[in-house]
Amino acid sequence: MYDRLLGIGDDHWIEDDRGDKAFLVDGKALRLRDTWELKDAQGRVLVGIHRKMFALRDTMVIERAGEPLATVRRKRLSLLRNHYLITLADGTELDVSGKILDREFAVEYDGELLAVVSRRLLTVRDTYGIDIVREDADPALLIALTVCVIHLAEKEREDE
C-alpha cells in the first residue's frame, strides 16, 4: 500500500506479493463524509468505507453489498492510545494495536494474530505491507480496517 493511501479523492492500487495490481482504494471526493470503495482488479466494489456522521466517538463503517460488515473505533479505557476495536456485524470483535501512525500494528481475533501491517522502506516508493497470517481471513476486510484505523489515527492527531 502506498503511504499516502488516505487522501480523499485519491485512488491507490494495492499490489499482491508478486507486484500485480490486486485491489483499488477509490477515494470519493466531494462527499459530506470521508468515503472510499475497495475494488478488485476488475473494478468490482468489494466493500464500502465511510465515516459515521453523528457518533459520539469517531467511527468508521465498513459495508459489503450495502449491509454493515464492521464498525471501527478507538478502544475506550485503553492505556494504549493506538488501540482500536473492530466489531463485526455478527458481534465478533477484532483488536488492532501498535504504532498506527508509523504503520506498524497487528490485527488479532481472540488473541490470535490475523494480520501484521509493517513499513517497507527498502522499496523505491514509501510503502507498507499487510501480511495476512490466517488463510481463512478476509483480505478485503483486513485492507478496509487498515484504511479505517490509519484514517482515525491521523484525524485524531490533526485534532490535537
Language-model regions: role of each:
Residues M1-E160:
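Intrinsically disordered, low-complexity proline/glycine-rich segments
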